[in-house]
Curated annotation (Swiss-Prot):
One Gene Ontology MF term: structural constituent of ribosome
Protein encoded by which gene: rpsB
Biased composition (Basic and acidic residues): 223-240
Disordered: annotated span: 222-267
TM annotation in the entry: none
Name assigned to this protein: Small ribosomal subunit protein uS2
């Protein structure tokens, strides 16, 4: 779980310049220093821990959380920590309709799979050099934009976003579909579009890494709880089945041995 020391070391408290802010963020601002807003880390840590528990519980229920962050500072962290918790991600360009027109996106993912199959089964070798080159170029483009969501068979249950201002289209699509949005809120953000906000710096690399790492750890913790519950359910089910079988056996014995008597103790 994140600590105040973690937040300070990663610069989570540094907001934007005072001229670049959203007045709705006033309640999360501690003060101003040298023209920069300072975020109230007491509120940050409270929201952080609350959101951590929300994400952990969602993962324990088997829900899918989509990681989104396409700006330069966020791309590597989004990919790294989404993969660590085996969640889908978008870390390059957000294609309009990725959520609201997901059926079309799935068709594009299918095209990627077909091209890969052509490479595997030798179909690509039967094409002209130009045709093969065009397909490889298309494959590279599809991998770049859709590689992180290629295994996402259905719409996600939640969306974790780095920089909800830059990713406003993704946030808008999630809002439209009623998907909860999780996001760090810098001082230029609109808190009204985020369901589970964490006030904090969404520009510094270390801060972004901390947010992504904590969400990834929350998901893995939730998955571990889910696996544990599943094992206990299986064990309990097996135990119940054995117990019922023993009861049936004893009942059969009783029904077939009407004259059964308990032997007297021998002296």
């Amino acid at each position: 779980m994140v600590t105040m020391r973690d937040l300070l070391e990663c610069g989570v408290h540094f907001g934007h310049q005072t001229r670049r802010w959203n007045p709705k963020m006033k309640k999360f601002i501690f003060g101003e220093r040298k023209g920069i807003y300072i975020i109230d880390l007491q509120k940050t840590i409270r929201y952080f821990r609350y959101t951590y528990n929300i994400v952990r519980d969602a993962a324990a229920e088997g829900k899918t959380i989509l990681f989104v962050g396409t700006k330069k500072q966020a791309g590597a962290a989004i990919k790294e920590f989404a993969e660590k918790c085996e969640m889908p991600y978008v870390n390059h360009r957000w294609l309009g309709g990725m959520l609201t027109n997901f059926d079309t996106i799935k068709q594009s993912i299918r095209k990627l799979e077909v091209i890969e199959q052509m490479e595997t089964d030798g179909s690509m070798d039967l094409l002209t050099k130009k045709e093969a080159g065009m397909l490889k170029s298309k494959k590279a483009k599809l991998e770049l934009y859709l590689g992180g969501i290629r295994n996402m068979k259905n719409l996600p249950d939640m969306v974790f976003v780095i920089d909800c201002v830059k990713e406003k289209i993704a946030v808008k699509e999630a809002n439209r579909l009623g998907m909860p949005v999780i996001a760090p809120l810098d001082t230029n953000c609109d808190p009204d579009v985020v369901d589970f906000p964490i006030p904090g710096n969404d520009d510094a690399i270390r801060s972004i890494q901390l947010f992504c790492q904590e969400m990834s750890e929350a998901i893995n913790e939730g998955k571990a709880l889910r696996d544990q519950d599943s094992e206990e359910e299986i064990q309990n089910k097996e135990q119940d089945e054995v117990s019922q079988e023993e009861k049936d056996d004893i009942l059969d014995e009783a029904m077939n041995e009407e004259d059964f008597e308990i032997p007297e103790d021998k002296e």
